[in-house]
Amino acid sequence: MQQDKVKIKLSGVSETLLFCLWGRAQLSKKYSSLFYDAKAVELAEKIDYDFSTSEVPFEGIWLNMSRQGNLPPFGLPALRAKKFDDKVKAYINEHPDASVVNIAAGLDTTFYRVDNGSIHWYDLDLPAVIEIRRQLLPEPDRTTYIAESLFDPIWCKDIKRTEDGVFMIAGGVLPFFEESQVKQFFSMLADNFPGGEIIFDAPSKLNDDFRAWGDQFPPEQRDAMRVAMVEAFKDWWEKAPQNQKDKLNNMLASLKTPTKPKGKEWADLEAWWNQLSAKEIGEIWRGFRASSDRYFGRWTLEDANEITKWDSRIAVIDQSPLFKDIPRDPSLSEEIRQFMDYSDKSGRLNIFQLRI
């Protein structure tokens, strides 16, 4: 008997919980030799939700690109999860009874992939997010959900058995805050978890130069990527309700760019996009960057040693490019493999591990 699907309604930031989950599930289905998250696949199939008609225009468009076999932006968290899994497993191999804290957990399912049968796991997120998590993922044994802001030190008191080791993971969260807030966060960790470790990801300043994202590819490949984006955009447009189309049109109208669409119908948008130069596309991306930190973040980090200057109690254990040691599996498209190589070589996206 087929289990009834769970219908949930989300909007805004909370909607991204589902997209990161969807990314892990999709990568698991398409590239299981690289990464497999059985719980994410199970959960994604359990939820009654149409990802292609997101209220957030970028996400609906990008998800359609993923379905067409192009580089999936929401596949990146899955590859990050693979790197985090390896780090968590290495730590609990040395500290089998450790407490592991998943900061800004969302609908993350790391516990199910790394559990050794004796760790205690904590999933920390805002109350509204934890409420959704409890609905979809009830707390398993040795797991505690904490409904608090990551900046509120009160949650630190909920972490028990710290003498057995504390390991924290913060995937895809710190870049969305101001540097002053990130400094406060690390100081709080050093106050409460001396000797603990944390792993997190952050983009470099180079990541802000959106025009350069396509410069590493040959002209023919850049053209193919543009065609794929238009096709994904059109697919989203045909399914999206009018209020979502209006939201995107308003966003485009607010951009300070030399050209704008002449109308609000699909033909107007397609004609506008196809006549844009590479420079204009770069300006458009920078305009989106300026208007929406929700997508592109605020805080960047070039070198983890910068954090040790904030607080002498903090030491660098490791820092490496996001895709380092991830196999360039032949099942991945050439575009994805080239993107991984370029990202690592340029240092755009990195993973950092610190001792507090």
Predicted regions and their residues:
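A short, conserved alpha-helix within the catalytic core of class I
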Residues: 176-189
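Short amphipathic alpha-helix with an adjacent loop that forms part of the alpha/beta core around
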Residues: 154-163
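Core SAM-dependent methyltransferase catalytic element
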Residues: 332-356
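Short alpha-helix
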Residues: 294-324
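Conserved class I S-adenosyl-L-methionine
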Residues: 199-221, 282-286
